[in-house]
Amino acid sequence: MSSTSAFSIADLLRSAASATPDATWLTTPETNQNYSWQNSFDRANEIACYLQGAGLNDGASVAIAAANGAAASFAFLGTVVGGFRATPLNLVAGVKTLGFVLSHSKTELILCADDCRPLVEDALAAMPDAPRIKPKIVSMDIDDGPRWVGSGITPIKVPDLRQPTAQTTGLLMYTSGTTGVPKGVLLSHSNLIAAGSNVCVAHKLESTDTGMCVLPIYHINGLCVTVMGTLVSKSGLVMPRRFSATHFWAQMQRFNCSWFSAVPTLFAYLLNDETKPILNRDRLRFSRSASAPLPPEIHRQFEKRFNIPIIETMGLTETGAQILSNPLPPAQRKIGSPGT
């Protein structure tokens, strides 16, 4: 962790693109498209250049409305590389909640996937304290990303990019609001990198690993565990648009994944599905559970049926996800406990 404590996410991407430019970081199963570290860095820089050319206030919130995939991933990276606050919108939170988030965050621009446009328009109409000038919407293709042509934005040049620091705020993520209105959590580049480092240390992630992201990256688990974990370890990331119990195991095998992070509900879905997976047991090292307590019976049944260890963990949005973790096998794990 100490080696990355003074880094920004822009520094992480630059380092990976310099060291292994042609190695794959992101794979999207629906299109079978691979994005190398160099390509990912270039895409992030392009978005950053447009955002810095958009006349936004320094450190402004840029909301992201998109399902998992290339567009959402590069929208996040481009926003933070540009020195702005990525504000992912929870697509199932409801119009009223999203209206509150857009107002409370003082969002100035929204990177919006085409299929999310009606939801975003309704949320803007529901803003409780509507600003005099509503946030600008830039449409995104779910695979190709933002459509800048016709946006009225002129990008700055890459050499002129203002670089974020480790202390720059990179993320404004809202809690679920189960006990009231959602609460916004600010995390700096240093916080986000520390979050990824915690995952790397606890699970011994290396550049040869490949993680499967089945949780939406508008939640802290999907973003800070799987995305940031792969960024810090310079390892591979496979990101389907949504979780499917029917296709999950085939995707794990097809893309040679070595780990995945899930929540108890998804482990239950996999147990209830009748698919008999063919897996590379030498490659698939572990799964991890977080976001809610994992019932011990589901834990035991899953490991017995699939012979894949589950590492139960615990995290908070305020801490960038993981704060507690059981160890990897063969060390002793505590079923029914996040490692306490």
Positions of PLM-derived features:
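Conserved AMP-binding/adenylate-forming core of the ANL superfamily
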Residues: S2-S5, W25-G69, S73-L77, G94-G99, ...
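Conserved pre-ATP/AMP-binding loop-to-beta segment of ANL
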Residues: A6-F7, P21-T24, P155-Y174, V181, ...
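Conserved AMP-binding A3 loop
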Residues: N34-Q38, G170-A194
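Conserved AMP-binding
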Residues: A66-G69, N90, L205, L215-H219
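A short helix-loop-beta submotif of the ANL/AMP-binding
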Residues: A67-T87, L91-V95, F100-L109, D209-T210, ...
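ANL superfamily adenylate-forming
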Residues: D115-A166, D273-E274
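Conserved AMP-binding/adenylation subdomain of ANL enzymes
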Residues: I193-T210, I220-S258, D273-E274
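Gly/Ser/Thr-rich phosphate-binding loop
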Residues: C257-A262, L271-R333
